[in-house]
Regions:
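Alpha-helix boundary/N-cap detector
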Residues: 22-29, 69-72, 76-83
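Short, well-structured hydrophobic secondary-structure segments
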Residues: 27-56
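Acidic, low-complexity, intrinsically disordered interaction modules
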Residues: 52-79
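Amphipathic alpha-helical binding modules
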Residues: 79-114
Length: 114
């Protein structure tokens, strides 16, 4: 199922990404642009996973551990999460044969979970 981030990502990023089941494994530095696009569309990046792409599979390398509680301000929640997502990616930059999966949610997707 396509989520809101998938809907707003440009085809150019999707074309360079590896599709693993229903998730895009986005290469560096495209992942930084994807986080920026998420921010512009008020989509919170709740977590980042780094994978090595091996053959037709993925090998988990690292994952983010930041976590914020949602208060009354969705925009602040998005900013807090996405700044941490960007910092995590910048501190865990990987080259070829690697990519990132962004776990994300828009306000209405989050509300649907409740």
């Amino acid at each position: 199922m396509q989520d809101d981030l998938d809907r707003v990502l440009p085809q150019s990023i999707k074309a360079r990404a590896t599709l693993s089941e229903n998730e895009y494994v986005i290469p560096y530095p495209d992942v930084l642009e994807a986080i920026q696009i998420a921010t512009e569309h008020a989509i919170a990046v709740l977590g980042v996973e780094v994978f090595q792409i091996i053959g037709d599979g993925l090998l988990a390398q690292e994952y983010s551990t930041y976590e914020f509680s949602l208060g009354d301000d969705w925009e602040a929640f998005v900013r807090l999460n996405n700044v941490q997502a960007r910092d995590f990616v910048e501190h865990h930059a990987r080259g070829e044969e690697h990519g990132y999966i962004l776990t994300s949610t828009s306000k209405h997707e989050f509300a649907d979970l409740r």
